[in-house]
Each structure stands twice: as C-alpha cells, then as structure tokens.
Amino acid sequence: MRVMDIICPIGKGQRGLIVAPPRTGKTVLLQQIAKAVLTNHAEVHVIILLVDERPEEVTDFRMTLAKTGAEVVASSNDNPYARHIEVTEQTLDRAKRMAEQKKDVLILFDSLTRMTRAYNNQLTSRGRTMSGGIDSRAFQMPRAFFGAARALEEGGSLTIIGTALVDTGSRMDQIIFEEFKGTGNMELYLERELADRRIFPSFDMMRSGTRREELLFTADELKKIHLLRRALSGRKPVEAMEMLLDRLKLTPTNAAFLKSFGG
C-alpha cells in the first residue's frame, strides 16, 4: 500500500475509481485496502460490496477478511438482477445513515460496471438506448451511489472506492467506464503488462492520481512527490514501477523515502 499512498492517496470522503482490465489484481488490491484501513484507522467501518461476482470470489473475500472486522455484503452472479439492486440500495442507505451518525464509513465495491448492467437489465420499458445497448436511465442509480461519497461538515464521512472494468471485449462495459471516467476525485489505473510480468502493485502511475492531494500531504511531501513524478515521467509503466519499488525497499516508511528523495 506504500505505492498507493504516494501515487493516489485516499482521504475520508473520497470518491475513487479503480480502472481494471481483467486479471490485473483488483481483488487482491481491494482486500489490501480493507486490511490497511482497518489496521491504521480502526474507527472506520469498512464494507465490501460485491455485485454479480462469482460465488468463489465472494467466499474468498469472506475468508480473507474474516478476522479483520470488515463487513462483506454480496449478491453473487447466481442471484437475479433484482437481488443485486436490492443489496446495492440497502447497503448505500445503511452507510449513509451511519455517516449521518458521525461515523466514518468506507465502501469498497466491485463493480460499477456490473451494478450498471444490473440496472440496465431491470428496466421494464426502453428509454434512449446508447451505443453498446445500454439504456441511458440505467446510469441514474449508479451515479447516485458513486456520488454519495462525502465528508460531512458536522462529522462523519462516506468514502466510496469502486472498480470499473475495461478491456473486456464488451462495448457496453467501455461505455459504462466512459460515463464514470472523471467523476471521481481519485482514479487508479491498473496496467495489464505489469500484471502479466507479475509486478505488483500493477499501477500505471502516470495515469493515476488524486485531486486536491495538497489536502493529504504536507507542502514538503507534495514537492517531493512532484519531483518523483517528473523523474518517472516518460518511462514505460513497467520501468517506472520497478524503479519506484527499488527505491522504496531502501526505506522503512514513505516519510523516510520522501525525506531522502531529491536531496
């Protein structure tokens, strides 16, 4: 998680999108985020929301996170679309109520793509059909879900980190991604070439980032991170990640790494 904390840190109230081609490690990444948050911020209530996932993936999440305190809520792909929608809306409603009670809540959900597909399949009458065969109305609830992330002025927060599936061969999946691209204040792109070479985390660092990161770093840390990005810019994702991982191994913490970087 050290790389993520540098490249695209997460703050309370964040709305983050993880852009994931197949087999790039998104499942493990979501599990690692949950574990890291619960280890370092025990006050946060973590909910893993799995929509239309394989039953074995749901079981893996529950077993992996069994002793962490994370709550796994799922509607696997052997359930009807109506069940996917019911679980999604119940989870969001409960998380919003908790945030209003001044609690900090994190929803990690997989995926925006399958959530939107579920709403598209449940529409009883057809509206305007977009390219890829998706009804424009299918985005209404997924947009509201993703947009619910915020830090409340009187205390409490709802952080939402969701995945969007790309490079699946489906035109509909690509349209769904394009609809949500740029709507978050954090985007993390996973890179297939890195995953194929078994280099993890498989982040495309130049395409990933957090908006208003100055709220999450000190002025000196931010300056060092900008220097780091400039040093890595122009390099291919594999080369950039290998270089960063090699440097991180030399220091025990990110604070120590940034202090040593750039003099």
Regions from the PLM with identified roles:
Residues M1-I18, T24:
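P-loop NTP-binding catalytic core
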Residues G16, T24-T27, Q31-G263:
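P-loop NTPase catalytic core
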